[in-house]
Amino acid sequence: MVDFPTRFDVIVIGGGHAGTEAALAAARMGVKTLLLTHNVETLGQMSCNPAIGGIGKSHLVKEIDALGGAMAEATDKGGIQFRILNSRKGPAVRATRAQADRVLYKAAIRHTLENQPNLWIFQQACDDLIVEQDQVRGVVTQMGLRFHADNVVLTTGTFLGGLIHIGLENYSGGRAGDPPSIALARRLRELPLRVGRLKTGTPPRIDGRSVVFSVMTEQPGDTPIPVMSFLGSKEQHPEQVSCWITHTNARTHEIIAANLDRSPMYSGVIEGIGPRYCPSIEDKIHRFADKESHQVFLEPEGLTTHELYPNGISTSLPFDVQLQIVRSIRGMENAHIVRPGYAIEYDFFDPRDLKYSLETKVIGGLFFAGQINGTTGYEEAGAQGLLAGANAALRAQGKDSWCPRRDEAYIGVLVDDLITLGTQEPYRMFTSRAEYRLILREDNADLRLTEKGRELGLVDDRRWAAFEAKREGIEREEQRLKSTWVRPNTPQGEAIAERFGTPLTHEYNLLNLLSRPEIDYASLVEITGDAVDNPQVAEQVEIRTKYAGYIDRQQEEIARLRASEDTRLPVDIDYLGISGLSKEIQNKLNQARPETLGQASRIPGVTPAAISLLLIHLKKRASGRQLEQSA
């Protein structure tokens, strides 16, 4: 074996969405970082659907962006269609979604990586970890080259023991065209960590030249075109294109039902559990037998290819059945399949064996992020990657770890759910998972997180200057609206009265008027003049004003709960010795080893009464130690 001459502070294994964000985060924080990938050409590759964002997911993308990450800016540079989902609903559940050109997105990520100071990239698969006395010391590559670092972030995606299924045939692979990580999977199974198998899948890709779009429903992007990054602008976007909607039908369902015995999922060949919220088409037909059709979205893969991604018909059925399925769908009667769909099974590790920092509890300096933790989705992976990379850097600097709370970020919700509850199926983020979603909107991710990102060293001068200008702009505009008055029987007063449908009875300041449901910011400044030129400032002023009462109530609730949420539980606490706790709860707490009282309260089966007993125990323990010190 040969030792690489440079010693690193942090090594990141894997160049997908988790790995790239992890490596960039650590390097931005000033530590010497190595990104080890099996193929430099696939850095930032979108292995599944060509899209970023969506319900719950865009909140994560905006939080990554607020902390200086790359995903949102790469989306603005590679996005070929942008839409706001839930635009008619409240701001808490609105979400930005973008179709991305695979080539442009990947190029944007690679450009960011290659221009990041403190970051080295090396092409080699990782086969082994160097571990000494329960502390990671480095990694060993496929060719026996040893890289040394006391902090290693594993972001292996679907590569650990990856097994690809098409019909009843299967073969080893990390994804189509890439080898799996067999040696590393074997090495990780030797560690005292709980391991399981999960499964995900992808649909066949279609040649757009063989599709009849005229019989489908066109789905254009939104106008005006949204942006994903807080620093983004629509001028960055390439050419914008439409998606197309068609549907499965009775014939499609008959074909699938007649061939379920050839499905690896239904014949017992696949052991791993698939994603509940992104089921295969055979799973949909089986689980929702009463439905006569299912939507299929034809999504362009890019501007320089004819390939289409038929979102909604992920499948692992044999190729001959896939061809029948595709050609049974309206508009695709003569479609040509460019690549077959497939399912992939892979190893994941129980995230309950992780700390909030995403460091494993049993091996110091070893961090996990992405699908290795049981999640699904680029956005979930990127969020974990950024957090793991930042905490690996903090550890290298001898500083305390950091993780946002559930009331601070969707990243906090994601991590808390994973390490407290674990997961038996691929975990996907939804806004419904957050208790405080009115506070955790996608539009205010920067106001929630950028200041902390700056403190950690994640946020550069360009982003910080833009953030400060926005924050000051919001305060200035709110103050202006508060101090500007409209009186009855004036031209402005009459215009406002006409909008309300009733005369003004007394004078109002503009902030009071904006809080009324009948008027929005654009209409208000149309009447009174002096609009701000930053649309993000205008958006924040309007949301904060209209939802002030609800936001204040949620903030009060958060303040009440924060005391118990932040109460740390000692690492050496003996739950078996706490009288009053049932054996079941003692065992649950002993196994989970929660870090805070708040986390303990979310463990299934741990009752409010048990939390009260824990609090009493902590107070007794603290007073006992004070007596010892005074004696």
UniProtKB/Swiss-Prot annotation:
Its cofactor is FAD. PROSITE patterns: GIDA_1, GIDA_2. NAD(+) binds at residues 274-288. The keyword NAD applies. GO terms for cellular component: cytosol. GO terms for biological process: tRNA methylation; tRNA wobble uridine modification. GO terms for molecular function: flavin adenine dinucleotide binding. InterPro entries: FAD/NAD-bd_sf, GIDA_C_N, MnmG, MnmG-rel, MnmG-rel_CS, MnmG_C, MnmG_C_subdom, MnmG_C_subdom_sf. Keywords: Cytoplasm, FAD, Flavoprotein, NAD, tRNA processing. It is found in: Cytoplasm. The keyword Cytoplasm applies. Pfam families: GIDA, GIDA_C_1st, SAM_GIDA_C. Its main location: cytoplasm. It comes from the Bacteria. FAD binds at G14, G15, G16, H17, A18, G19. Signal peptide: none annotated. Belongs to the MnmG family. NCBIfam families: mnmG_gidA. HAMAP family: MnmG_GidA (MF_00129). NAD-binding protein involved in the addition of a carboxymethylaminomethyl (cmnm) group at the wobble position (U34) of certain tRNAs, forming tRNA-cmnm(5)s(2)U34. Homodimer. Heterotetramer of two MnmE and two MnmG subunits. PANTHER family: GLUCOSE INHIBITED DIVISION PROTEIN A (PTHR11806), PROTEIN MTO1 HOMOLOG, MITOCHONDRIAL (PTHR11806:SF0). This is tRNA uridine 5-carboxymethylaminomethyl modification enzyme MnmG. The gene is mnmG.
